[in-house]
Design a protein with these regions (language model features):
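Hydrophobic/aromatic-enriched cytosolic interaction surfaces used to assemble or bind macromolecules
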Residues: 1-259
Length: 259
């Protein structure tokens, strides 16, 4: 705990993961907390040793994995209108908006978090910056463009949701979040994106990153529908001190790759 110089907080609808890093960017510890009710969140923040002992002295980034987000081209973005952009895709009552730049400042992702939830985090974590969780997926996938085919779907799995990106001729043409609970959900949403992009299902490539068990999807079922499918792990750029690397067993993007 004494070596902690930075915190990454991965905040899902029913899960909080705390990654503590030292001054060299090495992950020194990971705490994973499932929860059901929001009042449990405050108890988690109170008892976590990394947060309770170091959160007032180090930088912390809260990655919010929620349906409340939208992408805006930088040339059209006005920071004073962030809530307006977000309101096009979700209701913003009782929500605070935030934003961050992506793709060498060509894109801006606007996210939202409940005011009451943000107040809980702010109570226990100083120097808190906010980013939408999908920003990690987009940044990673844009870096993979040179390796992509002319028609490619990329899927990042995060708990009970997926981010699906569609690339045509190595350019991002589609990106959105979907809640997936079974094979039927996955096929429904992926087929919808394929149709929207006019992709040939028999020839386009689909790349999946993450743990299929988190969305209750079976590889053998998907291979009946996708002939060019690859399940992959990112090339590791996230480094660990001995003992902390077990986080990679989650197969999460954040366990392998650091932006």
């Amino acid at each position: 705990v004494s070596n902690t110089s930075g915190l990454s907080l991965l905040f899902y609808p029913q899960r909080l993961i705390v990654l503590a890093k030292n001054q060299n960017g090495l992950v020194i510890g990971v705490n994973d907390y499932p929860f059901v009710e929001k009042n449990e969140l405050e108890m988690i923040l109170q008892k976590d040793l990394f947060i309770s002992q170091k959160a007032s002295h180090c930088e912390a980034t809260l990655y919010v994995y929620s349906p409340d987000f939208c992408l805006v081209p930088s040339v059209l973005f006005d920071a004073s209108e962030a809530e307006t952009y977000l309101n096009f895709s979700t209701k913003t009552d009782g929500t605070d908006s935030f934003y961050s730049s992506l793709n060498e400042d060509q894109l801006v992702i606007v996210g939202g978090i409940e005011k009451a939830t943000l107040a809980i985090f702010s109570k226990y974590v100083n120097n808190l910056s906010l980013k939408h969780g999908s920003s990690l997926a987009i940044t990673y996938l844009l870096g993979e463009k040179p390796l992509m085919l002319n028609q490619e779907l990329a899927v990042i799995i995060e708990d009970n949701e997926v981010y699906i990106a569609g690339f045509t001729n190595k350019e991002l043409k589609f990106f959105n979040r979907f809640e997936v609970r079974n094979n039927q959900d996955f096929l429904k949403y992926s087929f919808s994106v394929l149709h929207q992009l006019a992709f040939d299902r028999m020839h386009c490539k689909i790349t999946l990153c993450g743990n299929l068990e988190e969305i209750n999807v079976q590889e053998q079922v998907l291979r009946k529908y996708f002939k060019n499918m690859e399940i992959t792990s990112p090339k590791p750029t996230q480094n660990y001190l001995p003992g902390a690397e077990s986080f990679r067993e989650t197969k999460k993007l954040e366990a392998f790759w650091a932006s």
